Amino acid sequence: MGVFSNLRGPRAGATHDEFPATNGSPSSSSSPSSSIKRKLSNLLPLCVALVVIAEIGFLGRLDKVALVDTLTDFFTQSPSLSQSPPARSDRKKIGLFTDRSCEEWLMREDSVTYSRDFTKDPIFISGGEKDFQWCSVDCTFGDSSGKTPDAAFGLGQKPGTLSIIRSMESAQYYPENDLAQARRRGYDIVMTTSLSSDVPVGYFSWAEYDIMSPVQPKTERAIAAAFISNCGARNFRLQALEALMKTNIKIDSYGGCHRNRDGKVDKVEALKRYKFSLAFENTNEEDYVTEKFFQSLVAGSVPVVVGPPNIEEFAPASDSFLHIKTMEDVEPVAKRMKYLAANPAAYNQTLRWKYEGPSDSFKALVDMAAVHSSCRLCIFLATRVREQEEESPNFKKRPCKCSRGGSDTVYHVFVRERGRFEMESVFLRGKSVTQEALESAVLAKFKSLKHEAVWKKERPGNLKGDKELKIHRIYPLGLTQRQALYNFKFEGNSSLSSHIQNNPCAKFEVVFV
């Protein structure tokens, strides 16, 4: 009959010893055995419940939350113990179906021990040198010494080793640096000045350039200085220099092209004395912004740019530079230079960022270099190793979300700061999966960890700010920095919700400013 056959109490016409009754039903007031029988009958469901719970605990088939659910369902369905189940509000009071218990369960069920421990088996890159002091993932560079590298510089690598190209030169001079061409040639990892490359290697950094150094008096009679030595550049910079000179703008030229001043000077110190600096690149290529531009910022000399079409993305403020996009722009730019040179108040506005601080967008860009490109390469490779393991059919199946009864769903996502390797757990409620809720949850998580932004030790003192974290961008892990900083955004909360639902245990990166 099964273990639950007697939950309904004694059958009519039988004593508790199961002998047929004679002379009708015995009187309850005159039969002690009937009283004992009723008490035992009431206790029987409790005994059965304890047996069931013991079995469940022994087999380890249910987690703590499921065990509570089973117990609740059993008691609420047994009329001898509870005739009416507790209301949902009461369940919350006694700890049932809570978000907290879901989070604890997800932390346990979603935890993973990866097969490769990078502290014991670091990322290994053949060639190059370890030119950083610290990295959030263990990584070594050098000769192979019998070990198969994770990656190596150059083509022709053995199976299992990814090939890397790294260069800070323009793709117009070195076509192999073009992202599409590098892929066609067989490079797995591209490291160039392009923010669309796998691991960008830009000219900018807080460590190399004292960008926030104070502005010095402009003492030179000429209002602009030029340092141009390659007179055969693949753009119109030489023509632009000549055209500016023809507009009666006095320019001191220290380079090999139209030199009229001795070039044996400290470039940055010389630029500090001029109101304008001709930051003319040798090619007009997206993201190709060299020291010419950043040295101008250090000097507090307004850069006049010939170069990348997206130079505004590299500027500390929208009015901090002048841009000659084509030869047609020379005349209006010259007119603007003359106006600013003659109006101190207007000119000072172009350097306002030196006193008030650059834009968050500029800080987010330069902060990327707070982690050395070689370390970012190691993080890129280690992330790839883990992603490949996660895609394996033998990888642990994780729930990544939790709902108890009719309560709201709790989603488990993972977030790390750009420039770091390990992920942190963040939980979102299904009814409030919004961008605002995601930012709030991420801030709360990292604040609870007393997290220090990766750029904290690199920025100049007046830009380090207080201990409060501010989010500039949150984006799905795996985007390029061009996508992350400029192109990507969720198209509303429904887009974010769909991403989380379609990507169990979704991973994100956050950029703090």
UniProtKB/Swiss-Prot annotation:
Glycans are attached at residues 348, 493. Disulfide bonds: none annotated. GO terms for cellular component: endosome; Golgi apparatus; Golgi cisterna membrane; Golgi trans cisterna; trans-Golgi network. The keyword Nucleotide-binding does not apply. GO terms for biological process: cell wall organization; protein glycosylation. InterPro entries: Glyco_tran_10_C (IPR055270), Glyco_trans_10 (IPR001503), GT10-like_C_sf (IPR038577). Residues 25-34 have a biased composition (Low complexity). It is a single-pass type II membrane protein. The chain crosses the membrane at residues 40-60. Keywords: Cell wall biogenesis/degradation, Glycoprotein, Glycosyltransferase, Golgi apparatus, Membrane, Signal-anchor, Transferase, Transmembrane, Transmembrane helix. Pathway: Protein modification; protein glycosylation. SUPFAM superfamilies: UDP-Glycosyltransferase/glycogen phosphorylase (SSF53756). Residues 1-39 are cytoplasmic. The keyword Transferase applies. One of its GO terms (molecular function) is fucosyltransferase activity. Pfam families: Glyco_transf_10. Residues 1-34 are annotated as: Disordered. May be involved in cell wall biosynthesis. May act as a fucosyltransferase. Belongs to the glycosyltransferase 10 family. This is Putative fucosyltransferase-like protein. The gene is FUT12.
